[in-house]
Amino acid sequence: MAQLDREDYALSLVSMIRLCGAITGWLTLAFIAFVTLSPIQDRPSIANPQTEHFAAFAVMALGFALGYPRRTALIAIFIVCSAFTLEAMQLLTPDRHGRLLDAVVKMVGGLAGIGAGRLILLVLQSQFARLRSPAKHSPS
């Protein structure tokens, strides 16, 4: 009975992680698009631009990696395309400029986020496997 409760808890935890990850990924993408295409004076600034680009794409990719764990290749393609598309779209605004370096930093941040997400999933899988396996030392 206790084993079943642990498995139910583990499954609900996985579902919650996926849901929160997907929501985080999409909300972060919307925020990045808004900030990237808004006038420069409306852009929030916390750190230097390269750090902000890296961190924003890392958070977005981490969310997507946790939210859609079986779609890693698709997420990687999406991150790379998003980085370059958003930089190119800045060329359409009069007060912004798209730069190749910014796109590369965003892409690297996104790939780092995917890597972090895969690592988190690997750790979670090993922990859940330990929950499912019978105790190695049964009381005699």
Give the residues covered by each predicted segment.
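Bulky hydrophobic segments
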Residues: 2-103, 107, 111-140
